[in-house]
Amino acid sequence: MKNLFESFSIKDLTLKNKVVMAPLTRSRAKLDGSPTDLMATYYQQRSSAGLIIAEATQISQQGQGYIATPGIYNSSHVAAWQKVVDQVHAKDGLICLQLWHVGRISHTDFQPNQSAPVAPSAIQAKSKVYNDKGFLDTSMPRALDENEIADIVAQYVEAAKNAKQANFDMIEIHAANGYLIDQFLRDRTNKRSDNYGGSIENRSRFLLEIIDRVIEIYPAARVGCRIAPVSTFNDISDSNPKELFTYVAEELGKRNIGYLHVIEGDTGGDRNNQAFDYLNLYRAFKEAGGLASMANNGYTKELAEAAQDEIDLICFGRPFISNPDLVEKLKYNLPLTPGDESTFYGGGEHGYTDY
């Protein structure tokens, strides 16, 4: 790709460089889902990124699957996120909020009235969540009915309104990593026989209904979407990822959204776990009217600079944890500070804001 450190415009929003900070769950919010002042410091420290995508943020209590993850579904959340956004903007940074519903990747402990988590179909994930006691197996989910699906679409709309009230520059719809939208998309987890199951068009309906509604709140160019076509994270897969995600990319492109964020390979793991033509996906998105392509997973400066011109933006995740000045380090070829995995989730400033 052309110079990683040049500015890049997504319509009327100009990123000062093409380095994007990936959304990273750090489990440092309050137990009620409110972001903290420490989180504001953390994001401000990383404001030299062209765009920060803030950590996955649940749109409802039902959407939560891990302890101390933030929410965006009440006025306390909005007020606390506003402080975070203000800190990033004070350093001339841009920040996007990733909207999240975990679906079946949850436990009754997190759910309203200790009820079962929800999913397109009642299939339990062979995956883990964590609370104050440590890691737990996910609970058996129940299948959503169509009225409940409409309610969740409406919750995404409210979350988008709340993000706008908190002054986020963009929002990203999290349709990857085996969470609720991904559970609808992929045929291993979606066994429905109604309007939301069966064909690729039906399995994509939930995502596209969400996109169609949130682009009434934010301009389409200020909305991104994250997918992970061949990731098996959270016990998920599809029998024909090429056909499914080409359709998804084209439909998102037709809606002229700001970017398509693609996790290449297995989330946080092997970039080459399964053969897949990502360049074709980026082309399909942009030829249909999408604005920018964003690649993610295991990128280094060398891999980024060698990337094809179909890729506009590169997302870096873990390196940003221990290198708040990652952009400068990449630009001037300075050594990167290694991260301490024991501090990735939970805790206070150690391993969070003290790098």
Label for each model-derived stretch:
Residues 1-355:
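Flavin-dependent oxidoreductase catalytic cores
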